[in-house]
């Protein structure tokens, strides 16, 4: 997976994703094997993202490294790998948890997210991300600090 930084972390749509990918210079991206100028479009797959307007299916681009043969999905920084819940909603859930607020507020703002999604996000946060963020002195807010 290769994360593409976007300033607008709340905007997720197929047209926005396509415009970001279209504007990318693939030869400037680096593979995890440390080679650059070696990635080419390999294919696409469908991925569901749960937004407040409803769940949408994105067509996500995959690239392949000509040096090591690895394939990578190109994800926007507003998307969390292996999750249907956008980064901004996950951040809000964790912040509400840390501030002892009602965790269902995010569910009300984004009806696509249910209580099981919230429990799963909090389990991952408590077991893994909370200590990593603290040890690296990365604050939970503002959102830009999480993705830089």
Set out the residue ranges of the language-model regions.
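Short, positively charged, Gly/Tyr-enriched micro-motifs
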Residues: 69-148
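Short, conserved DNA-binding cores of transcription-related domains
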Residues: 1-79
């Amino acid at each position: 997976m290769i994360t593409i930084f976007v300033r607008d972390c709340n905007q997720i749509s197929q047209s926005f994703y396509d415009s970001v990918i279209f504007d990318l210079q693939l030869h400037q991206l680096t593979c995890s094997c440390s080679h650059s100028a070696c990635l080419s479009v390999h294919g696409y797959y469908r991925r569901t993202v749960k937004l407040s307007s409803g769940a949408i299916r994105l067509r996500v681009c995959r690239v392949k490294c000509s040096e090591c043969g690895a394939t990578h999905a190109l994800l926007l920084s507003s998307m969390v790998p292996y999750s249907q819940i956008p980064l901004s909603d996950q951040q809000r859930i964790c912040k509400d948890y840390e501030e002892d607020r009602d965790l269902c507020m995010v569910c009300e703002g984004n009806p696509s997210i249910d209580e099981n999604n919230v429990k799963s996000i909090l389990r991952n946060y408590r077991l893994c991300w909370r200590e990593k963020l603290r040890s690296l002195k990365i604050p939970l807010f503002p959102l830009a600090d999480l993705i830089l």
